[in-house]
Amino acid sequence: TYNVRNGVFSNAQTGNVVLMSQHLMEGNWMRALHYLFPVLAFAFGVLVAERIGHTYKNARKIHWRQIVVLIEILILLAVGFMPQKFNMAATMLVSFACAMQVQTFRKVNGYGYASTMCIGNLRSGTESLSVYIRERQKGALRKALHYYGIILIFAVGAGAGGICSMQIGVHAIWISCVLLLAGCLLMIKEER
């Protein structure tokens, strides 16, 4: 959304809070709202994902995480059809979907992580590296490399997504739909 939807982040709410605060301090109230609404949409996405997890925790036919991924796919698919005159609504919807992703997928291989941002992963990886340097614990090194691997994959995806968004425009978000669908299908296969 930053590249094709008026320079507003959907996954990095810290950036939106910084930019919103700057505009508030400058007295530019309308521009500040431009950054506030995606933050609120993100918060609402966390609430909805948490509610889905609680409500469908014991569902037998489909795992609650698959429900969240299917909702994300539908949201992102719709956003790809939205013209740029609806950038604020599109950014809010993507923020909502990103929040659902972050709330739903909080661990990988037993380690807590953030799927749509890097700061927590960088902190955890570097903390583990420090433990390895200090105590020579091989498990700490594995953990550090795990987090740095997540950051590398994130960076490759972000870079590819940025290039695609510059080349394809708002429709580049549909690539995310394909990747999410593949992930959902892998989750179904894993359950069987």
Question: Residues of each region from the PLM?
Answer:
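Symmetry-related core transmembrane helices of the 12-TM Major Facilitator Superfamily/SLC fold
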Residues: 67-74, 171-187
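C-terminal ends and interior cores of transmembrane alpha-helices
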Residues: 72-87, 188-191
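Small-residue-rich hydrophobic segments that form or flank transmembrane alpha-helices
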Residues: 1-32, 101-145
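A membrane-interface helix-boundary motif in multi-pass transporters
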Residues: 60-66, 159-178
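Hydrophobic/small/kink-forming positions within alpha-helical transmembrane segments
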Residues: 39, 43-47, 151-159
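Helix-to-loop junctions at the C-terminal end of transmembrane segments
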Residues: 46-61, 165
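Short hydrophobic/aromatic, small-residue-rich stretches within specific transmembrane helices
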Residues: 31, 35-39, 43, 147
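Cytoplasmic-side transmembrane-helix entry/capping segments in multi-pass membrane proteins
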Residues: 61-70, 90-93, 114-118
